[in-house]
Amino acid sequence: MTAPTTRKDLMIVNMGPQHPSMHGVLRLIVTLDGEDVVDCEPILGYLHRGMEKIAENRTIIQYLPYVTRWDYLATMFTEAITINGPEQLGNIQVPKRASYIRVIMLELSRIASHLLWLGPFMADIGAQTPFFYIFRERELIYDLFEAATGMRMMHNYFRIGGVAADLPYGWIDKCLDFCDYFLTGVAEYQKLITRNPIFLERVEGVGIIGRDEALNWGLSGPMLRASGIEWDLRKVDHYESYDEFDWQVQWQREGDSLARYLVRIGEMTESIKIIQQALEGIPGGPYENLEMRRFDRLKDPEWNDFEYRFISKKPSPTFELSKQELYVRVEAPKGELGIFLIGDQSVFPWRWKIRPPGFINLQILPQLVKRMKLADIMTILGSIDIIMGEVDR
């Protein structure tokens, strides 16, 4: 005869870091009472590579290939933030054509990131078909990237004062064709997913974040806009040429997983609008600020006993970062991606602080999953949209 228990037997379960629903090396220590979640503790750091410290020992040009390894599904945004800081410190003007090319690349990258969020998110909650559909469109975007930059991922395309190369012949027509095709693809997603009763049952009312709660946690991006706050840095900060295009900020009031899905689906359509306007109105002229070619040719920088010959045979062009502090930010697919940069009259940054949107958005996860079912963890985590390379840096 077994003795009666006076307390509930709680079970502690490790989810990850090898679990397919963790989208990388995230580990969750989940305390369960049957199938109800009592507590959840995220364990981070499995993909930490010291990206901030590496930046302090590299010039901006040398550091550009590293930044594409933060959020490796939206690399154009990490490149943009890396060169925007030095451009503002040095008061460097970007030609209008280069600015339009940047906007086109950023919005294509936003669509690719949202597509690769949508497929695994649907697979996590049991819908396998969209996972294969999104790769069809994503491959077309990567073909465009490959034609313009030479790389399908990790493009290393942005430069201080412009971009690395002009758009090749025929690229604009090819991109316009993609825009027309993709709008029909989004309509297909809407028909397949948005009105699906099983999908709605899994996401509606799950992981609700209130307006004040979203502000207090410092959320940004679709996480913030799905909670009733119409905040988009492309409208707020007026960077690049976004003010010259006609588009709307996508937002919802409900704050649940369905609202976050609707915001991202809407953003893909708005990105296509921006790309079409930029392609049709792209001006002529140079694709880079030719003055930046000169950089610091007159004097050799002091390397502070840094063995530069082991990095490269020829010195890379660089310039001094003036002695001031600067915070720059862009609206990345996952939220506000920011850099706090401190220069000290050296070719190396004195401090390079990364503000990753995924890391800050992830902090609210334990609060959202408490008192929910175990299966809802996948839905809520998927709706947050994290990439562990960016979270752990």
Curated annotation (Swiss-Prot):
Pfam families: Complex1_49kDa (PF00346)
GO biological process: photosynthesis, light reaction
Enzyme class per UniProt: translocase
Alphabetized SUPFAM superfamilies for the sequence: HydB/Nqo4-like
Top-rank taxon: Eukaryota
Subcellular location: Plastid, Chloroplast thylakoid membrane
InterPro entries according to UniProt: NADH_Q_OxRdtase_suD (IPR001135), NADH_UbQ_OxRdtase_49kDa_CS (IPR014029), NDH1_su_D/H (IPR022885), NiFe-Hase_large (IPR029014)
GO molecular function list: NAD binding; oxidoreductase activity, acting on NAD(P)H, quinone or similar compound as acceptor; quinone binding
Catalyzed reaction equations: a plastoquinone + NADH + (n+1) H(+)(in) = a plastoquinol + NAD(+) + n H(+)(out); a plastoquinone + NADPH + (n+1) H(+)(in) = a plastoquinol + NADP(+) + n H(+)(out)
Keywords tagged on the record: Chloroplast, Membrane, NAD, NADP, Plastid, Plastoquinone, Quinone, Thylakoid, Translocase, Transport
Residue pairs linked by disulfide bridges in the UniProt entry: none
Gene3D superfamilies: Cytochrome-c3 Hydrogenase, chain B
EC number from the UniProt entry: 7.1.1.-
UniProt topology in membrane: Peripheral membrane protein
This protein's GO CC annotations: chloroplast thylakoid membrane
Main location: plastid
Similarity section: Belongs to the complex I 49 kDa subunit family.
Function in brief: NDH shuttles electrons from NAD(P)H:plastoquinone, via FMN and iron-sulfur (Fe-S) centers, to quinones in the photosynthetic chain and possibly in a chloroplast respiratory chain. The immediate electron acceptor for the enzyme in this species is believed to be plastoquinone. Couples the redox reaction to proton translocation, and thus conserves the redox energy in a proton gradient.
Oligomer status and interactors: NDH is composed of at least 16 different subunits, 5 of which are encoded in the nucleus.
This protein's name: NAD(P)H-quinone oxidoreductase subunit H, chloroplastic
Organism whose genome encodes this protein: Solanum lycopersicum (Tomato)
